[in-house]
């Protein structure tokens, strides 16, 4: 009896091992298939910034630049089951943001009619993180999109399908929308990567998205302006006001100077490219009881409002303002004083999509 039981377990183990060995693993990094960043072919890791910027930016900017926020991988396969395995180097979660958002991946698929679908995966967060997707159907004509973790650094990642199934990495074409922003644009506090507003926007517009956002450190700094300025973009988004509060160390005049420098630098190389400057998405809501923060956000947003009005009046017809009112966050939209939840992320993405649609129609 014991021998029969042992042989049964042994048979199951061998069958499971054989099945696991039948997967073929595809490495997007080796295939230069990482999207969502600048000069991806030059990067041999999952960072968003190239090595030469390490000596030019402040330490926290470099550290956050190693996070894979906004990075994504497109591929086609006729496999009905997909397994993702990878390793991250940082903490799995934060007090105000779950593991699935900080360290998880997220899988979508665009069908042959251009409609997006979402795939639910079973996940296991151990030393090697795994997401397994089963019974997807054989969607050979679909383009899958895998979003990488928002607030963690990926050391390695592989996509596994059965050995007899086709698999091919894809790359988006067209001029990208480049986003320079703060923690909100980096993805705090979406519950999963596909719900970060930049990733939602990427599914709603016909352009690739490049995410250059740094939690607490979106400050319109010269090295990052130089970095994004090398891209021939469809639109530049400067969403840094949440990290540029007016304090004793930063006056309204100094904030205006930062905005002026950023726009002037971009205009030297891209005189006609649309630039969007965004007010603080939070604040301005009397139903949220935080008078100090509301006033802080109002003051810095007022500087942005005045700047865009002045520059547009002087002749720059391709400079735009996205207002707090157009974004429309409310008492159901945030996890704290500023960071949007999934509802807030959708509101931000929708506001950008509407404005960008108008801009690109011109």
Where are these regions (language model features)?
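Catalytic nucleophile-elbow at a beta strand-turn-alpha helix junction centered on a G-D-S/GDSL motif
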Residues: 174-198
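Short helix-loop-beta junction
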Residues: 198-211, 309
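Structural recognition of the beta-strand scaffold that forms the well-ordered cores
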Residues: 176-179, 208-212, 235-239, 274-278, ...
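Oxyanion-hole/transition-state-stabilizing segment in secreted/luminal serine hydrolases
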Residues: 193, 201, 219-260, 265, ...
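Histidine-centered active-site loop/cap adjacent to the catalytic His
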Residues: 336-362
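The substrate-binding groove and active-site-proximal loops of carbohydrate-active enzymes
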Residues: 241-255, 290-298, 336-343
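Substrate-gating cap/lid alpha-helix
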Residues: 283-322
